[in-house]
Amino acid sequence: MKYVKVQIINKSTIELLEDAKKGEKINLDLINQVDQTNILNTITTNQKLAWEKELSAQFINQQNELIKNFEIEIIKLKTMLNDKEQALLLKTKLELQNQFQKQIENYINEINKLKLTNKELEITNQKQLESSLKLQRNEFEEKINQQNLTIEKLKIQQARSSIWAVAKKGNELEKWCENQYESYADSFENCQFTRYKTEINLLDENDFPNEKADYIFSFFGEKTNKIPFLSICCEMKSEFNDSKHKSKNKDHISKLVRDAKRANCKYAFLISELELETENDIQVRLMPTLESGVEVYLVRPMFFILMLKLFYKLAKKLFALNRFQSVELIDKNKLNEQFKQLKDNFLTKTFLEIEKVCKSNLVDIETLEKAVVKLRVRNERVLDQLLNKWTKKIDSFDLQLTKKITNNY
């Protein structure tokens, strides 16, 4: 019998592979050309979705379980850590207590040993011990006095130079001042800070040996100007603290005046570390020059830049006045008179105020120094009491030893 050939498309569809008539039959057992790919794809897709869903659920469950276990483990570890920390602290505390107790016992044993071994020596050498103790006491008091004097000197030096001492360390005063100016150079418009020998074209070092200043500060007013509107001759002076022949600030004034005149400077700064320990020292002041035509100012290094700025501001004001007023209306003498008035209003009043403040501060310093003396006397009194106390204890200790030895016999 002949059967019609067919193939299965899916679970609900069959496709005829040849023409068929009414009454012809289909043998389902003989269908061998089924499109297995479609069936397998369908089955595979469904299974894959089911597996993915199941795996996703399993993964979430496992993840939650792992998180839960991890949190439990963290709690356990924290508990263990706290327990171990407490145990370690307790152990350390006990060890330190034991060590401290052992040290105390060792000290007690050492003291007892010293007492036992030194009994006879202390009895027989009592006078020698007293003499030695007295000598040590005198030496100790002398050292304390010397140290107190040294400390006071260092305090005075530190109070007067603490602003620039660190920056100056390892450098000479000239280099320090040059570095200070370079640090503030942007504040000095149309200005120069040059070596003295360069400014006056002193090319030969043998010219004026030891007779030249260090620097010249020049204010030109405008960049196009070649002649400075204001010039200040600057000289730096310093010396070692242990110098045998210490010079004074006034010893350098006449030379500085000559240097200033040689460079056509009406003003001069003596930036000095000399006489720092002088009583009633004012950090910035006008020095007497016997109408030399040059104004010389003693300037401590920490006020060097401030003084330059002060003179720079004054010169800048006068330059502006000279620039905006007609020369036909104001002659040179009047301009000089205006500058003198401006200088008197600013500079003279400033120095008077500085002197007033310094004198007030010096009164406070004197009060503090008196307080230091009182503290030193109190310190010496306490030291004397303590030394006498221990001297008496030693005397008492020897007497007790003598009594014990006498009783033993």
From Swiss-Prot:
It comes from the Bacteria. InterPro entries: DUF2130. Pfam families: DUF2130 (PF09903). This is Uncharacterized protein MG148. It comes from Mycoplasma genitalium (strain ATCC 33530 / DSM 19775 / NCTC 10195 / G37).
